[in-house]
């Protein structure tokens, strides 16, 4: 897989996937993460089946938002933004999980741009960024109701694995992507802090 540019990569239809500029875009990332939180809160109600189990995750996410960039900043993390014209329409985040293992989090697309486009684009870019940071493997979890996301994770080479953290939602799915199963690519000087809690 060809690594993403350190600045940005241009996707079809005028969309640019680029790294966040923390010094000037912290509030923008907070707004996007709050949008993700609101979306996740919708899974606390029927018919998703997640129920109140989502509520602890919402409380943890509130703390994550307050502490940004936190684990999503250097040296082991990053946030990518999808930009179409003047608008930032989606985001995705990467953080360290274990040494040489990263984790994708916070894939969020604004409601007015949802469809089969931005999620896969962001995941591809995050995998390339993970390799730049030196990660050999990348993990991700998904709620059981996230059928489209689960499908494109598997299409991109993620394989199902046992739970790697105590997810509060029954039936949550866990996946891992391995760079060893792809053609060799340029790797950065990555490293990772000790293992973290899942949320």
What is the role of each PLM region?
Residues 14-16:
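Extreme N-terminal starter segment of soluble prokaryotic enzymes
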Residues 20-105, 110-111, 123-125, 129, ...:
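Acetyl-CoA-dependent GNAT
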Residues 100, 116, 132-136:
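Short coil/turn segments at alpha/beta junctions that flank glycine-rich nucleotide-binding fingerprints
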Residues 110-116, 144-145:
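Active-site acidic-Proline motif in GNAT/NAT acetyltransferases
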Residues 116, 120, 124:
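Residues forming the Rossmann-fold NAD(P)(H) cofactor-binding site
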Residues 136-199:
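C-terminal "cap" of GNAT-fold acetyltransferases
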